[in-house]
Amino acid sequence: MKDHITPNLLKLARLFKKKGELYIVGGYVRNSLLGIYETDIDLASKLTNDEIKELLFGTKYEVKENSKKLGTLTISLGEEKWQHSTFRKETYAEGGAHFPIFVEFVNTVEEDAKRRDFTANCVYYNILKDEYVDPFNGMQDIQKHLLRAIQAPDSVLQSDGQRILRMVRLASELGFRIAGETILSAYDNRENLADITGARKNEELVAILNSSRRYKISKSNAYMFGLQMFNLLRLWPYFNAPVLKVRFALTSKVDEQYRMYALIADIISTSKYKFSVSETVKDLLGPKGLAYPESKIESFKHVLCGYFDALSKMDNKTFFMEYFDDYKIISALLAKKSKKLHKKYDFYYNYLKNNKIAIRIKDLKINGNDLKEHFPKLKDKFYKELAG
């Protein structure tokens, strides 16, 4: 670790020493013990935001407060940035809303550590002393590639629903096993996901779908481990999906850029069309699901409707009049589902492209002015349509 401490960070630690020790904590420490040095550095100490502002006033270090209540701020110098958190205790309301209702600042690593989630994330590195502080034997669990709650799992997972999703994501990205009692607690506390915002669910699910390339040690099938954990823990209903488990017939085969489309298609197929394609997409991506913007929901609906219309063997002309612009994505899904149908639609698509056959108004070699010249008495809307 010592060899990866920059001169600017070392100097910052020396400034802190006037009032307290400065530690690196969390993902950077965990990953460094795995030989990975490609994550942001999180810092922690007993100093409050106001004390840090006073300490660094007049130096080259810049300070930007993130949350006074939580005691978090960003310290930067040039291109280097560090997130700092004051040692604290947290109290949560019932449910899993991911935000403490009460915060108390404390003075020791041991007290701060009790608010954290998993032992692997709970190793502190003292920058100046070049030594680790490990209150919950996290270094041993990191060596074992084991993800385990720091205390009784229920006390860790029942107060913050996002920790369940983070658990699945980290295990996927790092190739860690999850301790049995931690898995059981996640299952028992899964209802807390109902209190997590759609945006946070979206962030975690997308990270899981992309987990195969997160780190150099991430496995090529890492994302499938995460999705299978969703099945095991029965998490899908909390993403507004009409199923408890999903058959990943398509998701397991497509390239990363198409995985979200494939996942939704697999959810629809698993549900045996309990609701229409449009309804299911809207439910999954709407406010109670992944909270996508309306424009993106419409885009997903169009692609998924096109995919299922292709499976229903819609005639070529009708299909491409409706789905020509989205065919690249539909084709990627169809290729992994039915080689015969993919070949059929691809042949027609390439025929249209190679022969430059007009499908959309913008493909026509005339514009609104041409139309007006030959048909001057039409209503304005016809000219405007071609002008676009």
Model-predicted regions and their roles:
Residues 1-388:
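Catalytic cores of the polymerase beta-like nucleotidyltransferase superfamily
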